[in-house]
Every structure is written in structure tokens, then in C-alpha cells.
Amino acid sequence: MWCIVLFSLLAWVYAEPTMYGEILSPNYPQAYPSEVEKSWDIEVPEGYGIHLYFTHLDIELSENCAYDSVQIISGDTEEGRLCGQRSSNNPHSPIVEEFQVPYNKLQVIFKSDFSNEERFTGFAAYYVATDINECTDFVDVPCSHFCNNFIGGYFCSCPPEYFLHDDMKNCGVNCSGDVFTALIGEIASPNYPKPYPENSRCEYQIRLEKGFQVVVTLRREDFDVEAADSAGNCLDSLVFVAGDRQFGPYCGHGFPGPLNIETKSNALDIIFQTDLTGQKKGWKLRYHGDPMPCPKEDTPNSVWEPAKAKYVFRDVVQITCLDGFEVVEGRVGATSFYSTCQSNGKWSNSKLKCQPVDCGIPESIENGKVEDPESTLFGSVIRYTCEEPYYYMENGGGGEYHCAGNGSWVNEVLGPELPKCVPVCGVPREPFEEKQRIIGGSDADIKNFPWQVFFDNPWAGGALINEYWVLTAAHVVEGNREPTMYVGSTSVQTSRLAKSKMLTPEHVFIHPGWKLLEVPEGRTNFDNDIALVRLKDPVKMGPTVSPICLPGTSSDYNLMDGDLGLISGWGRTEKRDRAVRLKAARLPVAPLRKCKEVKVEKPTADAEAYVFTPNMICAGGEKGMDSCKGDSGGAFAVQDPNDKTKFYAAGLVSWGPQCGTYGLYTRVKNYVDWIMKTMQENSTPRED
């Protein structure tokens, strides 16, 4: 039994809508019971309406049918509520009440309260499916353009050039899909200047060659689109989309946006969307492709060539750094680079910048220093100084350098050439003073004669004239081209010499006018008795070691009789063949004949055989002070006539007829040209 009931229910649930039917109140035609509520759901096939009519109506009457009633509902709308008794007004029709609804569903609900004072028989009603005109029977028009009715339904259609949307009700214009690739063109809304279609979405695409941007131009009078609502929202709208940039939406009478739109893109989508209403003429625009502009970037510290007010796609500029600036990436030392305006509106090589030239850490110099710079960039200033008081800056310029635009440290006088610190010559740290009479001279300190060089073999002297050269007599080195030499020591004791500076000779240069003899001991001609020793390593100057000056070539350096000069050395004294401590004496210049008149001590030849020339200076003769054997090669130091703080080597101890009288000295002034030439030609180490 339950299976039969379930089957019946399922059959009712899934029953097809019927074209007609009957509805009777409970127990009809007998009196309906109290406290009853029953409903009937009526459904006819889609496309039909329902005609519901009553042939009998006998329900307890009450105000607003509050007690008993039959209610007719269509959707959420109550079509009617009935009670009381009704009779037909048409003798030819049994219908006492009827309802016509354009929908295919209807609900009928019957209610009775708890008591009835009289006997009421209820109602008898019938329904039939009726054809409806969807095109006219509804408040809302089902079709946007043409509505076509048929029995059981309707269909929509569109005028030419329109199409029916997927909802089968609304018509639209097929206005999408157009792609514009020409560099210039015109686009308008459908039917322009006639009213554009409603309920449409038109999409236009502009696709230009990369490197060109789309520029849209409109006139205000060419734009008439349905205005915005009260909230400011466009009902119909025109929108421009270029990449991630959007212009619009625009609507209203007269174009409200900029009349010239630069999109910065070669691709532009134009979207025109309309709603269901509106009768406006639409819009018309023009577009053209403008070469993509590149910004005129203000690259600091540079000049752009060529200079233009505007740069566009494919333009090439040369960016040249200002003086003192360079490109920090790319080629080393580059001062300019090229940049091209690219299709994306950006410059190539945009990462390259002009930054201050860096001159780097300045080079160090011998015998001097440079202060640590706060900066090494263009415009920075450094200063070189020499190790005073033993060195001075020979080539001028003041030692101040600035970081120049070419990346070099430059001096106003020397340019990029580094300053040269050379030894200060002829200035003893402690001037010589004759403190105590010694036979033939006085004790001296090496600080009185810092140029004094001691030759160990043979026992002799020399004069330091710069950091690489020693001046001495030719006869000192003619027999030993690799002499052992020392500087910086007052005493020549072995223990003291070990603490002094030993000089290593590289090459000996004897004046070409010096005559070499097989037996030097019998020499009677000491003309051109001068030689130079090139040292292997430079001598570091200090309080006990510094050179003596060379004489100038002007007449100021011509010695006069009576001019005083200083001699120093470790030569023979009255008591000893060799001195251990440095001795010195002050001697006057004497006429050359004074030396000629002195009888030669232990002559090896006739007195007339000894040669006296203008290349020799005669000095001494007073109080027994004179140079002697062992002093050879030492300087005869005379105060500089143009700078009283300095001494120059006026002569070199050469020979003498007799110790303690007059001595002969090589006149150095006559050999300055040879000295300078020899040193210049041999300024670099010799390759023997």
C-alpha cells in the first residue's frame, strides 16, 4: 500500500503541466468543514496564461474575508480574495467570478475558521490554459526591437545590421573586431551621426608599429553620448585603454576630456558601451601615430648633441661628460656615449652616468711626501712637500696639484710631471768654527762638512755633489776604479766607519784631459785633475750627509786673491801621516806664482818640469795651514757670492810642492760643463 502511495506522489510531483483542470472546496457540494486550510498549485505549459473561473461560490461572508476565504496568488502578487455568495450576471454563462493571468503558474488557497453559524457549500472552480500575447500583455517589453507572438510563445527579431544577443531578447550591433594599423585614421560610433544602437558593446583596436604612440584627437561638437545619472555614473560610456593606463569613461554632450590624448603606447583599445535607452548621435574621433617621445632627461654633468626641444623614436644623441667627469660603466676612461630613443619611449644606455673623474691615490715621490687627500675626485687638491731642510723642490710649481678632468694630478707649472725633491747643497748643519789651533788646522765635525767623502783605498777625499755623484781628483781613482767610500762620519776608525754610510761605486769617469802614466809617482803634470764617481745607489741626505754646490759659470764665481775657502780631510798632519778625526782649515786664495816659488819637497824631477795651468788654484801659505797627502780630492769650499748661506766646490785638492805651504787645487769652474754633461749622459745605470 505504501508503495502505491509513494508511486502516486512521485507521479504527481513529476506530472506534466495540464491544459485545464477542476478545483473543488472540501466536501463540495456538501458543507465544508471548519478549521480547514488547503491549497492547489496550478501549472500550465510555458507560453500560456491561466484563465481561472468560478461556477459556484458560497463561503461565509466577513469583512475583508477574514474568517473564511479562497485566495488566488500569482507569484508574490495576490490576484484576489473571495468570500460570500455570488451568482452569474449572464444567463447564458455559469461563471460567477473569473481571473485572467498571463503567467503559467497560479496558487489557490482555501481557509475556514473554527465555526460556521450557517451551512456553506464552498466553491467550484475550473482553469484552462489560454494563449497570451507576450508582446503586449506585459508591462516590460520582452524584446528590445521586434516582438513576434505565436500560440504558446513569442520570439524577438532585429532590424538589419543588428544581431540578437544570446538572451534571445536584446538586439545589438556587430561593432567589434575592427583592427586599425594605419598611422592615421578616423573611427566613429555605429550609425554616426544618427543615433547609436542601444544595449551594445563596441570594441575597436588600434595597433601601430612599435616606436609609435597612438594620439587621439576629438572635437567637443563631435561627441554626444547619454549623460551620467545623478550619482555621476555614465549610462553609456566611451573608454580608452592603453596598457595599464585608462582614459575615461566619458559621456555627456560635448567631449569632457582632453581634446588631444597622448597614450604613450602603440596599442589602444576603444570601448563604447550603451544601455537599453538613449537616442544620441554618438561620437567621431581621429587618431594618428606619433613617434614615441623619450624624456629629455637632465643627465647631470653632461651635454647632449644634438640639442632638441623634443626627442622621439629612433633619435640618437651623443652624451658627452663635462670636463672632470667620466662614464662610470662601460669602456674605461670613456667621456661620452651614445643613446637611442627606443620604441618603448626609454633611452638606451640609460644606466650610464657622468660622475666625477677619480684621479686615484697620488704617486709617492722620493725624498718627499704627499698629504693624505680628503678626496681624489675631480677638483680635489693635494700638496707635495720635500723632506726639509735636506731636500727642496727642484722643478718649482709649489707642490700643489689638482685632480684634472683627464684623471691626472696636474700642477700649474709642471702639468702631470711629479715634483722632484733634490738635495739642498752647500748648507752645513753646523757652520765650521776654528775652536782650537791644531798644527796645520782644527778639529772639525762631519756636520761642518756633510759633503765630505772618505776614500779608504787610496786614503783620500772627495765631495758629494748630489745623491748619485761624488767629485774627486783624477789621481785618486786612476789606480783604483772601485774605491771604497764612506760618508757621514767624523772619525774614520773602523768601528765608527761601520756605523756610517758606505758608498758603492758603479762607474768612474776620469776627465779625458787627464794623462794616465805608467808610473804615477813621477807625475809632474796635474792638469785636468778631476774625476766623477757614479754611485750604484742614491745617498739619503741628513744632518751628516748632504752635497756641496757646484760653482756657477758667471764671472761672480771667478776667485780673487785673498778669497777664503775651507778645506777638510783626514790627510797627513805634522804629527801623523793620517788623521783619525776630521780636520779643517780656512785658506786664502793666492797668486799662482806663490805656488811656483815653493820648492818641491822630495822632487822626482827637475822643478821646471812641474806644470802650472789656469785650471789650477793656488791657496794657503798662512800659519802653516795647508792640505797634504791624504786630503786629495777633497773640496776647497768657498762661500757662494750670491747666497751667503751656501758653499760651493771652487776647487779640489790636487797637489802641492810642500805640505804646510801653498797647495794647488783643480779649478772646478772650468769643468762645470764636463761635469754636467757626464752626469746627464749617465743619469741611468750603465749596462757594462
From Swiss-Prot:
Recount the PTM note. Answer: Cleaved and activated by C1R to generate Complement C1s subcomponent heavy and light chains.
Q: An example of a Gene Ontology BP annotation on this entry?
A: innate immune response
Activity regulation, in the record's words, is:
Cleaved and activated by C1R. Immunoglobulin-binding promotes autoactivation of C1R, which results in the cleavage of the Arg-Ile bond in the catalytic domain. Inhibited by C1 inhibitor (SERPING1).
Question: Transmembrane stretches, by residue range?
Answer: none
Q: Which InterPro entries match?
A: CUB_dom, EGF-like_Ca-bd_dom, EGF-type_Asp/Asn_hydroxyl_site, EGF_Ca-bd_CS, Pept_S1A_C1r/C1S/mannan-bd, Peptidase_S1_PA, Peptidase_S1_PA_chymotrypsin, Peptidase_S1A
Give the intrachain disulfide bonds.
Answer: 65-83, 135-147, 143-156, 158-171, 175-202, 234-251, 294-341, 321-354, 359-403, 386-421, 425-549, 595-618, 628-659
- Name the UniProt key words of this record, in alphabetical order: Calcium, Complement pathway, Disease variant, Disulfide bond, EGF-like domain, Ehlers-Danlos syndrome, Glycoprotein, Hydrolase, Hydroxylation, Immunity, Innate immunity, Metal-binding, Protease, Repeat, Secreted, Serine protease, Signal, Sushi
Q: What is its main location?
A: secreted
Phenotypic consequence of residue 60 to A: Slightly decreased association with the C1Q subcomplex
Where is it located? Secreted; Cell surface
UniProt site (Cleavage): 437-438
Domain CUB intervals: 16-130, 175-290
* Sushi domain residues: 292-356, 357-423
Q: Any idea where the Peptidase S1 domain is? A: 438-680
**Subunit comment:** Core component of the complement C1 complex, a calcium-dependent complex composed of 1 molecule of the C1Q subcomplex, 2 molecules of C1R and 2 molecules of C1S. The C1Q subcomplex is composed 18 subunits: 3 chains of C1QA, C1QB, and C1QC trimerize to form 6 collagen-like triple helices connected to six globular ligand-recognition modules.
Disease implicated: Complement component C1s deficiency: A rare defect resulting in C1 deficiency and impaired activation of the complement classical pathway. C1 deficiency generally leads to severe immune complex disease with features of systemic lupus erythematosus and glomerulonephritis.
Protein name in the entry: Complement C1s subcomponent
Organism from which the protein derives: Homo sapiens (Human)
Recall the taxonomic lineage recorded for the source organism: Eukaryota, Metazoa, Chordata, Craniata, Vertebrata
